[in-house]
Amino acid sequence: MGKGGNYVTVAASEVDELRRKNGEMEKAVEEMKKEMLQLWRRTQVAEEAEERLCSQLAELEAESLDQARDYHSRIIFLMNELSRLSSDSASASP
């Protein structure tokens, strides 16, 4: 009974150790799940922000293109006016 009793004691202590380690691992898994959920939420927020920024960038690009076209038209108009005024002043000179 001596050896058998020792074996049961060792087995019981091993079971206790395994239960303790299992509990630690379960806590670690729960912590990892929480961290993963937080990272997922942060990723979602970042993706939504990226979508908003892309949308804003597209709007700004369209606006800048419109402004560039307006400025180009204005420059052409002013060049034509300058040319016309130069021609008028040259023909008006004696």
UniProtKB/Swiss-Prot annotation:
Induction: By stressful environmental conditions such as salt stress, AgNO(3), and sulfur deficiency. Induced during oxidative stress. Accumulates at the beginning of an extended night, which may indicate that it is induced by carbon starvation and in response to sugar. Induced by a combination of light and plastid signaling. Keywords: Coiled coil, Plant defense. Disruption phenotype: Enhanced tolerance to osmotic stress. Increased susceptibility to pathogens such as P.syringae and H.arabidopsidis. InterPro entries: LSU. It holds the Pfam family LSU. GO terms for biological process: cellular oxidant detoxification; cellular response to sulfur starvation; chloroplast organization; defense response to bacterium; defense response to oomycetes; positive regulation of DNA-templated transcription; regulation of defense response; regulation of response to osmotic stress. The keyword Coiled coil applies. Residues 15-63 form a coiled coil. May be involved in defense responses monitoring. Probably implicated into osmotic stress signaling. PANTHER family: PROTEIN RESPONSE TO LOW SULFUR 1, PROTEIN RESPONSE TO LOW SULFUR 2-RELATED. This is Protein RESPONSE TO LOW SULFUR 2. It comes from Arabidopsis thaliana (Mouse-ear cress). The lineage of its organism: Eukaryota, Viridiplantae, Streptophyta, Embryophyta, Tracheophyta. The gene is LSU2.
